[in-house]
Amino acid sequence: MNKRMVYLGIDPGKKGGLAVIKDLNEEREVRTYPYSDDTLKKICKELTADWKNVILCVVEKVGAMPKQGVTSTFNFGKGYGYILGVLEANCIPYQLISPQRWKKHFSLDNDKNKSIQTAKRLFPSVSLLPTDRCRVESDGMAESLLMAEFARRLSGGTI
């Protein structure tokens, strides 16, 4: 039986990320992106055109953040709703997973550098740089990649 699945991880927010893991029988294609609304729409359109019912997405379940202003909270909630709306509109199944759950699976805490190191260990050939000109790796891209891997393991029954 051929195994063809796509796993999408989304770390919402201004410095968030998107990651796609495509299992193509014996090969695997992995891509990461800094988060943007346009990138999300483009990826979802591409995936639904080619993959239909073989997509699983994990979106980090977020709540209000202490000491965040009213406007910031509203804008973040609006962006979060946008992500869920795009997924729903494209009929992409998703699960909201708390950061504690997926981070516990990878033995991580709130240290963003540990997320980057774990992503680099699991996917050494994948760039976590938002652009070619950046020198600092993106923790949002690293965490979205770990969420996509969490989705892959969840789908495979290893969690």
Give residue ranges: language-model regions:
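Phosphate- and other anionic-substrate recognition elements at nucleic-acid/protein interfaces
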Residues: 1-159
